[in-house]
């Protein structure tokens, strides 16, 4: 299985382009890192967790660990700002537990269209982080407490964006959504001792094919 992760705790930049995305266009990739992307130019057609989307200018994309993504049609002028956090770093800070309340909503709706004024605020934030990173000798030298602060900013900002879409966060919950919520809760409670698929399937009253 093809996967995507990053070696440093944190990366940030403004130059994800068509050339970059084409590397992930032939086959789906499993995301191991946490990624926050903002489209600032062009458009992209992509599949995220098997659902097809069109990503346009000022769309904010949240990809969490275990998401799958494949890019299809990519405009020549496509460009994204991005921030990424490694799988190792996110595991160490217990990412699943800290995002459990809205992780299912992000998984079902990974793309959030932003108003231009809000998008500009995010662009300013990315630029500030890019500037801060340029002052460090290398990415590997970034203080872990700072990285935790960066991730907290992105997660809190993302949570607020989704709270403003009540038809997503407060709508009728599908069975799939409910199963996913319960699964996340079980993982948080038992992940240190239980690693068997059959255990979680039994707790959810599901047969293994599910």
Q: Predicted regions span which residues?
A:
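Generic protein-terminus/edge-of-domain signal
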Residues: 1-56
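A hydrophobic/aromatic-rich effector-binding and dimerization subdomain
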Residues: 2-6, 74-137
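Amphipathic, well-ordered alpha-helical segments in soluble domains
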Residues: 35, 121-131, 150, 154-157
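A short, compositionally biased micro-patch
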Residues: 39-41, 64, 74
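Short beta-strand His + acidic residue motifs that chelate non-heme Fe in jelly-roll/DSBH
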Residues: 45-47, 69-74
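Conserved metal-binding segment of the jelly-roll/cupin
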Residues: 55-68, 84
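Key DNA-contact positions within bacterial/archaeal DNA-binding proteins
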Residues: 209
